[in-house]
């Protein structure tokens, strides 16, 4: 039987509601959110402050009604500070997007972060998005599998839950 550490259990409780359900609000979009807001207000009227304020307001108003919020620190730093103190925090740990010139949509972690640093910033868990095509070349799949193994080892070392967000795609369709 698999066992969960006390630290992970306590963090999972912080992320869960009274029924043991993780009812999380996800607003960790970065590049796509910036593009949507630029389109909505127009290039000439757009500023990054609008993105920061949007995430702050959403966090401030909605974290009273959810058990956890998923935010990125890059654009969501104000939202992290504005969240309800009873709401758990899941922080994005991957770089946004992928290099379209490199086959495989390989995952990359934020270069200046670690799970230990996310914990120090108040995270109860981390999230990593991984693009996955099971029919891709074995060399690419091996890189992704090794990436996830290293991520699991790091999570075990600092006793933090990590959620993997798999995005399944077909590399033959662009």
Question: What do these predicted regions represent?
Answer:
Residues 1-136:
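Alpha/beta catalytic barrel-like cores
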Residues 130-137, 144-174:
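Conserved anion-binding
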């Amino acid at each position: 039987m698999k066992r969960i550490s006390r630290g992970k259990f306590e963090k999972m409780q912080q992320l869960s509601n009274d029924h043991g359900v993780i009812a999380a609000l996800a607003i960790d979009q970065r590049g796509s959110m910036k593009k949507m807001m630029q389109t909505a207000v127009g290039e000439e009227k757009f500023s990054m402050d609008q993105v920061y304020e949007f995430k702050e307001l959403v966090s401030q108003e909605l974290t009273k009604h959810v058990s956890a919020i998923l935010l990125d620190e890059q654009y969501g730093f104000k939202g992290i500070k504005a969240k309800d103190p009873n709401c758990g925090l899941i922080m994005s740990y991957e770089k946004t997007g992928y290099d379209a010139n490199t086959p495989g949509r390989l995952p990359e972690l934020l270069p200046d972060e670690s799970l230990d640093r996310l914990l120090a910033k108040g995270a109860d868990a981390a999230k990593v998005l991984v693009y996955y095509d099971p029919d891709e070349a074995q060399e690419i799949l091996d890189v992704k599998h090794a990436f996830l193994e290293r991520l699991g080892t790091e999570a075990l070392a600092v006793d933090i839950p990590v959620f993997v967000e798999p995005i399944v795609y077909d590399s033959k369709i662009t």
